[in-house]
Regions:
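Helical "lid/coupling" subdomains associated with nucleotide-phosphate turnover
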Residues: 1-142
């Protein structure tokens, strides 16, 4: 597996064409989504003070985020994009995480988000309409 992952590092345009490579790509995509969200979401930590137990938040609280937008080759070409995207959401095995608890999963299959950010500076309504049309909706996740 290590050799195949190393090969993928230098062949970033490769789209899996067999079950083994699809499984490796799936695992890498899940890990990437989980890592990316972990870097953005904060956490709650128990701290003991002279007044007793309290919680300290570090980072951003994303628990109430309504939408998670995913993009990238491993996600837009995957057979199980929705399953991979769920790694962005709260997981009970990490109760201190401040990841989104419930969110609608959206997929940017055409890589338009950056362009829409630029377009929105002059034409916000046009950018919004294009995004609503082009970004795929996977529904509400829990």
């Amino acid at each position: 597996i290590n050799e195949k992952v190393e090969w993928l590092e230098t062949h970033t345009d490769y789209i899996p064409d067999n079950d083994e490579m699809e499984k490796i790509d799936y695992a890498l995509a899940c890990a990437a989504v989980e890592t990316a969200v972990s870097r953005h979401a904060g956490s709650l930590e128990q701290v003991y003070t002279p007044c007793g137990l309290t919680y300290v938040q570090s980072g951003k609280d994303l628990r109430r985020v309504k939408y998670v937008v995913v993009t990238g080759g491993a996600l837009i070409h995957a057979k199980h994009t929705e399953e991979i995207a769920k790694y962005a959401l709260f997981d009970e095995t990490a109760p201190g995480s401040l990841r989104p608890e419930k969110a609608e999963i959206l997929v940017d299959r055409k890589y338009i988000l950056a362009a829409m950010g630029l377009l929105s500076q002059q034409y916000p309504q046009a950018a919004l309409e294009i995004m609503k049309k082009e970004i795929a909706y996977y529904g509400h996740q829990e």
